Amino acid sequence: MSHVLAAVAWPYANGPRHIGHVSGFGVPSDVFARYMRMTGHDVLMVSGTDEHGTPIQVQADAEGVTPRELADRYNRVIVADLHGLGLSYDLFTRTTTRNHYAVVQELFEGMYRNGYIVPKTTMGAISPSTGRTLPDRYIEGTCPICGYESARGDQCDSCGNQLDPIDLRNPKSKINGETPEFIETEHFFLDLPALAGVLRQWLDTREGWRPNVLRFSKNLLDDLQPRAITRDLEWGVPIPLEGWRDRGDKRIYVWFDAVIGYLSASIEWARRSGDPEAWRRWWSADGQGKDAPGYYFMGKDNIVFHSVIWPALLAGYSGEGSRDGQPGELGRMNLPTEVVSSEFLTMEGRKFSSSRRVVIYVRDFLERYDADALRYFIAVAGPESNDTDFTWAEFLRRNNDELVAGWGNLVNRSISMAAKNFGAIPPVDPAGLTEADEALLAVARAGFGAVGELIGRHRQKQAIGEAMKVVAEANRYLSEQAPWKLKSEADRPRMGTILHVALQVVSDANTLLTPFLPHSAQKIHELLGGTGVHAPMPVVEEVEDLDGGPAYPVLTGDYSVGARWESVPLEVGRPLDPPKPVFRKLDPSIVDEELARLAG
């Protein structure tokens, strides 16, 4: 058993999350974490709500509330959404905890001591009409690199390059449309050029990454520039240096503090577990965690922060760049093993947009449909390696033709026939298994290797496809063997054998699909007469801040129980009851209903 870190991108707490968000960071990470636990690994899956930065401050000002009040509101909404989806976080926390502030400031101070954070005078944007600072994200213009006309002041979403507002052509304020003025201001910069060598060495060893992620990351190293990590802002983590700590107008930039959340969440989890040093088993590069792999899950717009910025912070804190230096009190820490990036999900051919009502929020989806229906769609048709379009017609088809008519039908008819004719798991005919019986059982057993290998390589579309092939083979077997035709007493042993084989394959297929469809997996486990926890679920707990701050909700859970990644022989004679359908067949009218909602 090894320790495995599953670090999941932090959803921003300025509103509810839509299904496009969870298709990138949520479901893929949970599938991976559940599979790794089922194979015996000690997984630590962490994340939380990202609660600092300009968008929250601007929105709070517009609503007449404090940034903390706004973050509190949406933190609870997001926690409820992710709980409803069954995402199995060991800890889902937030970036406004005092623990997080302390860890962020420790990394900042350590990098500053090592010379990888340096002060620099730069040009900052202000609003001519109000005199207030204009944050990068609220300035748009033409990208000087690719010509994209809606590039933000911090990043171009078209070419992916990081930018400064002053570099934009024809910059405009997104708040009121005016042209910003640029004035001198002092900030701290991350000296990325001094860390380029160690980053390149590390990326050269990442041969197993998705090609687009690795190629994009290496290209970023060709022209690395120092990057500002503080901002003229009132809402954020204070700068932990003499003369700066008490300044109300300067804060650490949100992208710097958010990626450190993976570490601070791990430390918080350890403190809450009663072993404050336990986090080192997943992080320490010199001790017991030196061989622990770390997998980072996100959408493609966050690649740069995980393949360049975060490794640079870890390397700089450890003193591993061209300036050398000494590790801080947290010690040397592991760089990411793999950055697992998903592409974008669109909706009915358009980009998700709350303002244009091109959106379906997770909470609204879960009010009308089952969580596993969405999880299935994301797994089988999500944006794993290409931008993918969510349409209600395709969602309906996948649900009714595959989930209900394929998997649900196999479960229902196998258990129904066994319950009706035997009332229990039937025995195998003493005469033995036929070639057809053996062949189907072999297909199911082979699925554990095939599906598991694909999940381990983050090929989840192929993985669930292999699992559904087992389902299709079992349905074909039942149709060919036709146990319902074996009505005589002499045929009863053969009927029992067919149904025993079918039920065994249902059990095996259920295990193969458990990482993808945990809610239904638990139900099917119970329909097969199983007891106890098959697919453990997260719980929402209200906790006190460990260092005296306000209380807040977290997602956590006990995932040490549950199924293992193996075929478990069914117990002959275990009672079976007539099953109720596991999946809901959806009426075709939902397509027009949902499209009407989009039209507003």
From Swiss-Prot:
Q: How does it assemble?
A: Monomer.
Instruction: State the needed cofactors, names only.
Output: Zn(2+)
Organism of derivation: Salinispora arenicola (strain CNS-205)
User: Function of this protein?
Assistant: Is required not only for elongation of protein synthesis but also for the initiation of all mRNA translation through initiator tRNA(fMet) aminoacylation.
InterPro entries documented for this protein = Anticodon_Met, Met-tRNA_ligase_1, Met-tRNA_synth, Methionyl/Leucyl_tRNA_Synth, MetRS_core, MetRS_Zn, Rossmann-like_a/b/a_fold, tRNAsynth_Ia_anticodon-bd
What protein is this chain from?
Answer: Methionine--tRNA ligase
Question: What does the organism's lineage look like at the top?
Answer: Bacteria, Bacillati, Actinomycetota, Actinomycetes, Micromonosporales
Family of this protein: Belongs to the class-I aminoacyl-tRNA synthetase family. MetG type 1 subfamily.
Q: Where in the cell is it found?
A: Cytoplasm
Residues that bind ATP: 354
